[in-house]
From Swiss-Prot:
Keywords, comma-separated and alphabetical: Antiport, Chloroplast, Hydrogen ion transport, Ion transport, Membrane, Plastid, Plastid inner membrane, Potassium, Potassium transport, Transmembrane, Transmembrane helix, Transport
Reactions that this protein is recorded to catalyse: K(+)(in) + H(+)(out) = K(+)(out) + H(+)(in)
Principal subcellular localization: plastid
Annotated InterPro entries: CemA (IPR004282)
Gene transcribed to yield this protein: cemA
This protein's name: Potassium/proton antiporter CemA
Species: Citrus sinensis (Sweet orange)
Membrane-protein topology: Multi-pass membrane protein
Keyword presence, Repeat: no
Function: Contributes to K(+)/H(+) antiport activity by supporting proton efflux to control proton extrusion and homeostasis in chloroplasts in a light-dependent manner to modulate photosynthesis. Prevents excessive induction of non-photochemical quenching (NPQ) under continuous-light conditions. Indirectly promotes efficient inorganic carbon uptake into chloroplasts.
A Gene Ontology term for the protein's cellular component: chloroplast inner membrane
Segment forming the signal sequence: none
């Protein structure tokens, strides 16, 4: 009985470790097998090269640069045959290199999307099958938060709100959204409209929900916490 009771916290602790580190375990576990399968599938089944707007723009800029060099050399006519042949070979090599580079980008995108999908499926299955463990973990967290003093709670709320919706938060959201972009293998630039919209609106939405929660829930549950929070903000 004692051994059984001692194994329960270890089981729940292992559940926490499993949930926290799963996003890193999945890419490491499927790195070689899944990446080789995606590479083989892409190389054998794709007859055309698909490019997004950013990739297409980069390739066009490179080709325009090479074409300008080609035309300039043709106009100068200095060592024409030899120079033109070198430029033709260089243009061909550059074309092959660009195609390989963008094929690797597409493989990278598919691989990351696949690993994230697998991670989501595993977490969904875990939340359904291990509902009891998650319920107990949730009760532990609630008990821990309940035992904290009102001052520590107010300080924690102030710290989290300043971090997420404070004056310097847009830069943090920009880095976080950029990380999500890279994690899914998506290309983005500094002028990305979606990134700008999310960075400008998401902190405002969070701030609105937080203020509503603060005055509707905390005012009813712990008025002293609200008083301490307002005193610290002032």
């Amino acid at each position: 009985m004692t051994k059984k009771n001692a194994s329960i916290p270890l089981r729940y602790l292992s559940s926490i470790v499993f949930v926290v580190f799963l996003p890193w375990w999945i890419p490491l576990s499927f790195n070689k097998s899944l990446e080789s399968w995606v590479t083989n599938w892409w190389n054998t089944s794709q007859s055309e090269t698909f490019l997004n707007d950013i990739q297409e723009k980069a390739i066009l800029e490179k080709f325009i640069e090479l074409e300008e060099l080609f035309l300039l050399d043709e106009m100068i006519k200095e060592f024409p045959e030899r120079r033109l042949e070198k430029l033709r070979i260089g243009l061909q090599k550059e074309t092959i290199q660009l195609i390989k580079m963008h094929d690797e980008d597409h493989i990278h995108t598919i691989f990351h999307f696949s690993t994230n999908t697998i991670c989501f499926v595993i977490l969904s299955g875990y939340s359904i099958l291990c509902n009891e463990e998650l319920f107990i973990l949730n009760s532990w967290v609630q008990e821990f938060l309940y035992n904290l003093s009102d001052t520590i709670k107010a300080f924690s709320i102030l710290f989290v709100t300043d971090l997420c919706i404070g004056f310097h938060s847009p830069r943090g959201w920009e880095l976080l959204i950029g990380y999500v972009y890279n994690d899914f293998g998506l290309a983005h630039n500094d002028n990305d409209i979606i990134l700008s919209v999310l960075v400008s609106t998401f902190p405002v939405v969070l701030d609105t929900f937080f203020k509503y929660w603060l005055f509707s829930y905390l005012n009813r549950v712990s008025p002293s916490l609200v008083v301490i929070y307002h005193s610290m903000t002032e």
